Curated annotation (Swiss-Prot):
Organism per entry: Coffea canephora
InterPro entries, per database record: MeTrfase_7, MeTrfase_capping, SAM-dependent_MTases_sf
Molecular function terms, GO-annotated: metal ion binding; methyltransferase activity
Name this polypeptide is given: 7-methylxanthine methyltransferase 1
Highest classification ranks of the organism: Eukaryota, Viridiplantae, Streptophyta, Embryophyta, Tracheophyta
A single BP term in Gene Ontology: alkaloid metabolic process
UniProt entry tagged with the keyword Magnesium: yes
Length: 378
């Protein structure tokens, strides 16, 4: 089965769907001030036609209500900054393209649009028709828009996904090179980590080269991804998956060869690795780059009627459900659907242990980029 056929969130609105389990979380809330600053710089740059129609794309938008929460933040930021900077001007139309792979459940977003538009009108005073949302399916490692046609490109929790499993893992190192893990975890051998870094470098370079061409000169990108900081990082969601899969092997419910032959196309770069790639590619300048921590259960709320002793387990089950909604399609394609309930039951146990220790944070990186002006524009 082709990777792009399974590289999507759980579809629909069922108990394990991304639409039901994903919600506005602390990580998105932390991104919003950076988003507003990025929009402020964008509006001050006086790009072509920006006072009439701002063209925006959300790359790797996923599906369900969470997608429109991100769109809401973008629209609110544009309106807020626009009022602060140019309050004498009429609000520009905002055209937003939602991008993800062809298998993404775009329909779960489209059917929410009528109520979303009404809410924008009621809460933000944006007349229906002044914000236009459409889909642009396809890999963001390929061309999506005409040259110099976009003002702002946004991507949240997407660029850590690679275009493919690093070829070096199989071609150069052999099928079982990454024993005991599904990605480039801290305990992986250096050649495995290098293979993943090489693939990320190739992919992120392609991403920057292609999409910088789609931006107007001095257009902006704002990218957020999971990252690594040092060897003392707390377990991230993929580490929890590693633990749960290894539990199934120890219990005899899964063959070790199944794990050794599977690698997920996911890489957590360091801030320095991202910085070096941007500088080497050369089409954009870094305006700011920061890291921050977000908690597994940042979006979780609980009724006070629950006994305190049950909070950790309930939170852990929430964490497991959220991780399942993101990773189940690609995991089920390799390990089989039948083992999924057992896998995520064990993941919830590991999440509970991590939460009990007062841990459960993962590192995030946010970077704001501006396309360098052409020499003729300087």
């Amino acid at each position: 089965m082709e990777l792009q056929e399974v590289l999507h969130m759980n579809e629909g609105e069922g108990d394990t769907s991304y639409a039901k389990n994903a919600s506005y979380n602390l990580a998105l809330a932390k991104v919003k001030p950076f988003l507003e600053q990025c929009i402020r710089e964008l509006l001050r740059a006086n790009l072509p036609n920006i006072n009439k129609c701002i063209k925006v794309a959300d790359l790797g938008c996923a599906s369900g209500p969470n997608t429109l929460l991100t769109v809401r933040d973008i629209v609110q930021s544009i309106d807020k900054v626009g009022q602060e900077e140019k309050n004498e001007l009429e609000r520009p139309t905002i055209q937003i393209f939602l991008n993800d792979l062809f298998q993404n459940d775009f329909n779960s977003v489209f059917k929410l649009l009528p109520s979303f538009y009404r809410k924008l009108e009621k809460e933000n005073g944006r007349k229906i028709g002044s914000c236009l949302i459409s889909a642009m399916p396809g890999s963001f490692y390929g061309r999506l828009f005409p040259e110099e046609s976009m003002h702002f490109l946004h991507s949240c929790y997407s660029v850590h996904w690679l275009s493919q499993v690093p070829s070096g893992l199989v071609i150069e190192l052999g099928i079982g090179a990454n024993k005991g893990s599904i990605y480039s975890s801290k305990g992986c051998r250096p050649p495995v980590q290098k293979a993943y870094l090489d693939q990320f470098t190739k992919d992120f370079t392609t991403f920057l080269r292609i999409h910088s061409k789609e931006l107007f000169s001095r257009g902006r990108m704002l990218l957020t991804c999971i990252c690594k900081v040092d060897e003392f990082d707390e377990p991230n969601p993929l580490d929890l998956l590693d633990m749960a899969i290894n539990d199934l092997i120890v219990e005899g419910l899964l063959e070790e060869e199944k794990l050794d032959s599977f690698n997920i196309p996911f890489f957590t770069p360091s801030a320095e690795e991202v910085k070096c790639i941007v500088e080497e590619e050369g089409s954009c300048e870094i305006l700011y780059l920061e890291t921050f921590k977000a908690h597994y259960d940042a979006a979780f709320s609980i009724d006070d009627d629950y006994p305190v002793t049950s909070h950790e387990q309930i939170k852990a089950e929430y964490v497991a459900s959220l991780i399942r909604s993101v990773y189940e399609p690609i995991l089920a394609s390799h390990f089989g659907e039948a083992i999924m309930p057992d896998l995520f039951h064990r993941l919830a146990k590991h999440a509970a242990k991590v939460l009990h220790m007062g841990k459960g944070c993962y590192n995030n990186l946010i970077i704001s980029l501006a396309k360098k002006p052409e020499k003729s524009d300087v």
